[in-house]
Amino acid sequence: MLRLSRLPLPPVLQRLTGFSLFVWRRAMQNRCLQVAASLTFTTLLSLVPLITITLIVVAAFPVFEELSSQFKEFLLRNLVPDFAGRIISVYLKQFTDNAGRLTAVGLALLAFTSLSLMLTIDRTFNAIWQVQRPRKLLHNMLVYWTVLTLGPLLLGVGISGSAWILNWSGLARTAPGLAGIIQNLGSLTLATVMLTVLYGLVPNCYVPRWHALIGGALTALTLGVAQAGFGLYVEISRTYQFIYGAFATFPFLLIWLQLMWLTVLIGAELTASLSYWKGDVWRREGDSQRRFCDALDTLVRLSQAQVHGRALGQADLRHHIDTGYDEIGRILDELARLGLVQRSAEGLWALLYRPESVSLLRLWHHFVLDLNASPADDAISHSLTELVRPLEAGLDISLAEFLHRYPPAGPAVTLPAVPRPG
């Protein structure tokens, strides 16, 4: 495989290319292509019900009642290309007309269909961020029901505000071209806000706001370009529409939904990977030995904070440890399973024991190699035990003794006083 350093590219482009390949490898490891296909079929079932619920929420407020058609146009324009929007509008009208005759069971199934899409997104995003402790189902249901109700209201405010500004300024009449550009910028801004909220709130872990904003903005811009390019492709491919007529819409719609979800998922991978950009952490090879070193570094920083009666967040740890936020989260979860650290309700972490009571050998056995768990009659394990015995003898020290022998090179952690959890 050709190394990037051998390519005739400037260092900045080499770094960007290498980081992009790192994000793509993560996307492939998380099976984003297959997940995008799954979300595509889920969207086919829930797209019309989801838009219907959104329109019902908007229509419930008289101030937005006159904007319902603009609201529907905005949703269809940003979710699907024009050719599919015309078809979906027909089904949407039929569905909305029949929604008033639904029973309580029917309404519950309608809401469940919409929530199932959100729960699928929740599971996917938590997998991308390597979250091992997902939220409880009831909490998820409450969060996404809030999104279904408050999301349309925020969009309604944005659409009504932009419409009022265009009418008040007279641009819609005097400069329709400029008004169209402003509308497109408004759509891009709203899409950025929605994706930023999605990337920032859905994963059950710490996501820096700037990372969510950068990922949301780049994904929204990519979706806009992809939608324009796909629309151009559909215009060129008139042969399919001539042969298949209205049936040609559905294959194109499937392809677009697959492309849309793949873009959103890769945007999520980018957002989750941005913490690896600082210090070129993405160049490191992740292995058990590296994780052991990061876990030991984590305990060192927590022990420094313990001296001052403080707890640390993931952002504080990332400032001293060269790895990603998701990797820090996994290490903290592993240390919590060992009973060494505890997380507070505020999301801060603290060491539960004095450094004198924390064994490095136990840490080595958990993260790297534990031959004691092998069968007694395993000859290979027995031989390896003899080989690594001197190494384990050197590791059979406490965290306090390690700190005494090898004081940390970085500065001690200094933060505002925060009480340690329980």
Curated annotation (Swiss-Prot):
Compartments, as annotated in UniProt: Cell inner membrane
Alphabetically ordered keywords of this record: Cell inner membrane, Cell membrane, Membrane, Transmembrane, Transmembrane helix
Membrane disposition: Multi-pass membrane protein
InterPro entries cross-referenced by the UniProt entry: UPF0761_bac, Virul_fac_BrkB
A Pfam family: Virul_fac_BrkB
The name this protein goes by in its record: UPF0761 membrane protein LHK_02978
Family, as annotated: Belongs to the UPF0761 family.
Organism: Laribacter hongkongensis (strain HLHK9)
GO CC terms of this entry: plasma membrane
